[in-house]
């Protein structure tokens, strides 16, 4: 008797084919391979996803901070998010708005409380309301973890940040998450 060979994909193959377009290309930048001072320059982003640079470069500071601090500038170049080092109260996140020909006064990012320590590496999705940052403290798996929150336009504050979870966080330090949607 002849064996009948099915050309119809199995349910598993159909599921795989339907899920494949949703996969993301993930790049890990290992701190053992890339040194601290050039870390931010190794993150490839399309212009539509904004720009990342060191705090010292953005603010034209010659003196290095004790910790590498970063600034995220949105795709339109009219908003910047950054953490500022505060050894007494812990780092805080701030936002600047471009007003005509210069940056306006800094505004503290509201909604991220003192449960987060050594906040750093902000990144805002192109939707303009989803913020990622790195911090130690509340709900950390180990060392620095990636947290995410969204902006509530009614209250003018961000919602309570949530740990972004595995596989983006680990028991080691996880510093930065940038999502290039383009």
Question: Where in this protein do the model-derived segments appear?
Answer:
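Short, conserved micro-motifs composed of acidic
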Residues: 2-182
